[in-house]
Amino acid sequence: RKTDIITVAWAGTICSDPAMLSISVRKNRYSYDIIKETKEFVVNLTTKQLCRATDYCGVRSGRDVDKFQEMHLTPQPSEKVKAPGIAESPVNIECRVTQVLELGTHDMFLAEVVAVRVDDDYMDENGRFDLNAADLVTYSHGEYFTLGKKLGTFGYSVAKNKPQSIAGNNPKHKSKSSTKKGVKAKGRSGKHTRKEKGKK
């Protein structure tokens, strides 16, 4: 079976330790059977530059077209799963399915995150993903939006004697690694890895 790209609207983190996420897919989608059979997939975060490709991959079926070829996207070999990521995406999250929940219009795939790859260009000085620099895209009610500026840090509403930056920008820096609790995360160079305790 060939690989495919599907645009998923319903997705999100569901557990910190072990790191897990979920995606919900209609049963009639071409990618549904691929994921159901292989029990793995890669989540690729999308950017402003990838918005047209994101839309195309949501309205065209892999039964009829090769989306990698049509959108000039590059398959990125994965570290832990056979499913490829998308090289043009700033973040590739490799997942293995642990459970499938039949809900209604969609089935929900619960999956453990087994590896994460992050483009070095979007890492800050602390080795964390710089959300502002990535210019990520979100989707709501049939429309695409870029994410806004940082508004604050978790806990800033009750913090004392610690100045908080509201709507500030993080400086753009390069790094060789990123971190996610319990999961090794590599930069594109793949030369360095490290682990760090995550935050809820």
Where are the language model's segments positioned?
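Basic, polyanion-binding surface patches
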Residues: 2-200
